[in-house]
Amino acid sequence: MKSALSVVVAAAGVQQASATFGLLGGGGISFNFGLDWSGAKTFPCPGNVVNKCTPEQENGWDWSDVATGSLNTYAGFNFGGGWSCESNFGKRGDIQGRTFGLGKVISGSCDQGDEAGLSIGVGASAGIDAFSIDSFDMSTEFDARLEFHYDMPDGSVCKQTSDCKRGGSTIVNKQCGGAKKVRVIYPKQIIHKGISFSKKCKISCHKIKWHCGKPTPKPSTSVLTLPSTSTKVIQTTPVTTLQTYTTPSQQTTTPEKETTSSKETTTSAQQTTPGKETTPAQQTTPSKETTPVQQTTSGKETTPAQQTTPGKETTSSQETTSAHQTTPGKETTPAQQTTPGKETTPAQQTTPGKETTPAQQTTPGKETTPAQQTTPGQQTTPSQPTTAATTTPATTFVTTYDTTSTVYTTSTKTITSCGPEVTDCPGKTGPHIVTVTIPVSTTICPVTETRTQSQGVPTTVILPSKSETTVKEQPTPEQPTPEQPTGEKPNPVTSQPPQSTQTPPCPPVVPRCLNTFVDLKAKCADNKDASCFCPDKDFVKNIFDCIYAHGESDNIISEAISFFQGICGRYIPENPVIATGAETITQIITVTGTPHITQVPYTTVVVATTITENSSTQTISTEVTIPNIVMPTPTGGVPNQPPATASVPAGQNPPPVTGQNPPPAVTDQSPPPAITTGTGGVIPPKPTGSVPVTAGSGRVGAGLGMVLAVAAFVAAL
């Protein structure tokens, strides 16, 4: 069975952080997650509102003190739709409600699709003005799906859908708090082959438990902070750095036209301050005694020299850092030892890195003392990744993308003179030839690529590596301000995603639901902390239920589910619920049309689960197409590195991972997506069986859709 679902995206956030679509495919649109995202208002749920209860509610309602017969009022509440109280004697052959034993129940019949249903609401004499139900003990005439619609004080409706068994089910409410009325509805049922449903269903309520008291406090977490004069936690991402090598020598390099007295005092760096980018000076500022730089090349890691000996003479270079000022990068490593000397060797390779750490204070003079104080930023050391190998049956990778070709016309023009209004005429000194290139037409062609991974080929996936974070002290305000270097500031080496002022086109229900349950979960910094909440199965299920509870229409629900799946897509290998958890919701909503968003890459992911029941094995394959979304690092949070990815050429199987650390490469500020780039595949570890996940490449297209396909086969053991 296949259900076509629409996909559109939206939101907004804090500190102008950006999220980028399409990092799987190397492109896409950047959106601004500003205060509208991080500061989104939470929905009222039983865990975050003050729930006043009457003494009767404190103990729960089991109807033992209710007279049999028609029920219209009880404990100040109004009962509508045809409730009646009856004794449950457990007649022979009657299994309805037997899970809850004998006793009294209240029952009523509902017509399919009747929005009024059976209702329970606050009356004038209830003594309270709102309520939060913790759970219902319910049973139905036959196994069926029920809906519970809560009428909220602001006029909105909070919805919950739950399956109910004939023998009895306990239905827990986690979404709707502070309601005025609840309506129990028998909705249109999900059609299964060979099963038909009656147009009317008898529903019985055995007990109601109420959520009473103050809001549930957010679980506390302990944060280890080292003693310091000033502590500041900054967000960092494991990134590649550049490496500096400085070696001592026995000779002093002297410039031809500039010499200084041998008695001059060595001038060392007086002050360095931490910053967020390394700024090499483009022009040399000669000092009394400086070590020249002969060559600048990029390396892998930035570390200061272990031993540096100042010399007596000064030379300048086109690329060197002034001896009076060093602007460090995000992470710093102080010089280990500095000793005086009479001869200076030029640095053989010196390059500013993305992350450098100078010494905070160095005592100038003929003898230079080791650094007394260093202030590195937060340093993250990723642990060795763990690997899980899985042998899977043949897997088909389907990659859909667009190819774009543009036709240009080129012409050459000669400028011999200009009008009087042109003050700087290029033809003033003679004929000037210019070339003009104009795009004529652009053609976009859809391309679909299909390839199959051979059966039995082992594929290894690098699971998310955990990071150790150390917070070190920052300099106090009394630290002297260093002299700024002269020269023009060059472009930083760091590659960052572009900042955008465009708000993501997703329904507001997404950030509101995230904030609602992030507030009830420990450790997560905010609703952008995807690495914290996406691997949590219960959290993901709560978000899907919240989207259904508060989505204003079926189209909005569909769009919001797809957007949330895009946020958590990279974590599907470790949490398949991201792909499969919304299946029930997508089966009961009706989507009209197909909303589009241009230039949004997306990936098709297939999750296969194997279920063994009695003497048969059932494999269910769920296919979901999701947008590629990378959330920015949350404010004040420590980013967790997402699962590593593998990139393979088209038509080939993903290469096995040996477990060794690959050579570092320059990365973006945002962590890379965990779903494969190109046409690679990701195979997750086994949670409860074989759950392979494959992913096609991201593509840039004119439309965006989500397809859930459930295919099953049964093989007798």
Swiss-Prot record:
Residues 275-366 have a biased composition (Polar residues). The keyword rRNA processing does not apply. Disulfide bonds join 513-546, 524-532, 534-568. It is a lipid-anchor; GPI-anchor. One of its GO terms (cellular component) is extracellular region. It comes from the Eukaryota. The keyword Ion transport does not apply. Residues 652-674 have a biased composition (Pro residues). Residues 237-254, 262-274, 368-392, 484-503 have a biased composition (Low complexity). Residues 696-717 form a propeptide. It is found in: Secreted, Cell wall; Cell membrane. Heme binds at residue 529. Keywords: Cell membrane, Cell wall, Disulfide bond, Glycoprotein, GPI-anchor, Lipoprotein, Membrane, Repeat, Secreted, Signal. Sequence repeats lie at residues 275-286, 287-298, 299-310, 311-328, 329-340, 341-352, 353-364, 365-376. It holds the Pfam family CFEM. Belongs to the RBT5 family. The CFEM domain is involved in heme-binding. It contains 8 cysteines and is found in proteins from several pathogenic fungi, including both human and plant pathogens. This is Adhesion cell surface protein MAD1.
